Amino acid sequence: MANSSARPAFLVMTALALLLLLCVGPGGISGNKLKLLLRKREAPAPTMTPVAVQESRAKEFLSSLRRPKRQLWDRSRPEVQQWYQHFLYLGFDEAKFEDDISYWLNRNRNGHDYYDYYQRHYDEDSAIGPRSAHSFRHGASVNYDDY
């Protein structure tokens, strides 16, 4: 009985001694490895690099730079007003243009709703219909492509 309880204690003591030997003992040429791991690295303090221009002069120079905004379609310019009036005279409608842009930009975002990523624009109620009977819905009174 005494022999069986002494074996785990002996194993624990051996493991502790081995751990202490590994951690505290000298690590060959480099010395104590645990101390080397735990010690903070000593680095020299960063030195200020010499600068040709003082900070205040540099900030003054950078703050003086102002980049003018380049707006081609600035409505306050008289030639732009003239161009815009001419576009309106030609039939250009800005609201319709914005609608068209949003339509064409969003067209491919939900393309899988229509058969195989294609949006086909023929009339469902036409007499002949599409060439393939399985490619489109027949007989509805609405052309679903328009919605």
Curated annotation (Swiss-Prot):
> Which GO cellular component terms, listed alphabetically, does the Swiss-Prot or TrEMBL entry include?
apical plasma membrane; cytoplasm; extracellular space
Residues of the propeptide: 32-68, 132-147
Report the locations given in the UniProt record.
Secreted; Cytoplasm; Apical cell membrane
* Keywords per UniProt: Cell membrane, Cleavage on pair of basic residues, Cytoplasm, Membrane, Secreted, Signal
> Could you give a single Gene Ontology term from the biological process aspect?
cellular senescence
Entry-linked Pfam families: Augurin
Q: Signal peptide: which range, if any?
A: 1-31
Spell out where the chain crosses the membrane: none
Disulfide linkages recorded for this protein, renumbered to the chain, are none
Q: Which family does it belong to?
A: Belongs to the augurin family.
According to its UniProt entry, the function of this protein is described as:
Probable hormone that may attenuate cell proliferation and induce senescence of oligodendrocyte and neural precursor cells in the central nervous system. ECRG4-induced senescence is characterized by G1 arrest, RB1 dephosphorylation and accelerated CCND1 and CCND3 proteasomal degradation.
- Protein name in UniProt: Augurin
Lineage of producing organism: Eukaryota, Metazoa, Chordata, Craniata, Vertebrata
Q: Which gene encodes it?
A: ECRG4
